[in-house]
Design a protein with these regions (language model features):
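Phosphate/dinucleotide-binding and metal-coordinating scaffold of catalytic cores
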Residues: 1-333
Length: 333
């Protein structure tokens, strides 16, 4: 139950998704989870294309870290509308799979019924807000970084990388050679001063580091090793989840997340996110289930990056091993 204190008469959030509203939130656990007593929160919208749909996705932030519905303590949580998902289960099934594969920091899902200013908005999926923090990507925000490769290209700190010339470019136009890369978390304007740097200086350090990883992926021979740059098990698990769910969003690319514990570490793929356009849904119900995840006609940078990764024999070998193990032990579940 969410009641806006500044607009108690509203039937829906209006304006920008980033507009924040004070609200009172409470939650009935219905015997399955602990009730959440009334408390003040900041309530706002979220999402990209889904924000413009009839059923709005939401986000709320509490004053202190709280364990909600059995999830780890955190301040911020998301309410996924699943408006284009007639099953209301695409995200839930995909994230279950990520947890089954023991992908670090995989999200959890709890179905909830949402009441907004007393109006029933229907079924939502309550989940962790992805970001650096104890409830999501639990790494040191002063040492690590969470990146997102996404054609929306709408974060404050971002750069585009040309996969063929191996250089950064000025714009993130979505084409076969360009990969739009963004800093998802933390807020560099808050972290950099504590490290004795400006936000731009800290951004440049990480931009160069991420670019070095991309260059390695694009230039290393298929028989070479990428273990110096990426955690290949995380890559394989990432592809298994997206392949089984037929999630073509990663090709565009959309919601393609990677993180690194520190500059001395390696990049890990995940947490996986956003399966609205998955399980053969591609703008219409009944799209062919055998549509290739990667083919020779891809016109987006995501295609090019994924093809380079999957051409690596080390990754392909582990992919086959983990796939066989999943078919034997996991698929029957």
């Amino acid at each position: 139950h969410v009641n806006l204190t500044d607009h108690p008469d509203w039937t829906e959030l209006t304006g920008s998704k980033s507009d924040e509203h004070p609200a009172i939130l409470r939650m009935d656990g219905n015997g399955m989870y602990d009730d959440l007593p009334e408390q003040e929160v900041i309530f706002r919208g979220r999402g990209n294309s889904t924000w413009n749909m009839k059923k709005k996705p939401y986000r709320f932030k509490m004053d202190k870290k709280t364990a909600v519905c059995g999830m780890k303590k955190a301040k911020s949580f998301a309410l996924i509308a699943n408006y284009i998902d007639c099953s209301l289960m695409r995200n839930t099934v995909a994230l279950w799979l990520a947890n089954y594969l023991e992908m670090p920091f995989a999200n959890h899902c709890v179905p909830v019924k949402v009441y907004f200013n007393g109006i029933c908005k229907g079924q939502y999926m309550l989940t962790e807000k992805t970001g650096i923090g104890s409830g999501s990507v639990d790494i040191d925000e002063e040492k690590g970084m969470l990146f997102e490769i996404d054609s929306n290209y709408d974060e404050d700190y971002k750069f585009a990388y040309d996969l063929y010339s191996h250089t950064t470019v000025q714009n993130g136009n979505n084409n076969q050679s360009t990969l739009p890369v963004m800093i998802a978390d933390p807020d560099l304007t808050e972290i950099a001063p504590a490290l004795g740097l400006t936000a731009d200086e800290y951004f440049d350090t990480w931009k160069n580091d991420f670019s070095a990883m991309l260059t390695a992926v694009m230039t290393t021979p298929s028989t070479g090793s990428l273990k110096e740059y990426i955690d290949i098990e995380s890559v394989v698990n990432f592809f298994i989840v997206n392949s089984l769910s037929s999630n073509h969003e990663m090709r565009h690319p959309k919601s393609f997340k990677l993180y690194k514990d520190s500059l001395d570490g390696v990049y890990k793929f995940g947490p996986v996110w956003d399966f609205d356009w998955a399980f053969t849904f591609d703008g219409r119900e009944g799209a062919p289930a055998n549509t290739p995840m990667v083919d020779n006609n891809g016109d987006c940078g995501g295609y090019t990056f994924i093809k380079a990764l999957l051409s690596n024999e080390e990754i392909r070998t582990l992919y086959q091993q983990k796939w066989n193990a999943f078919v034997k032990d996991g698929y029957p579940e």
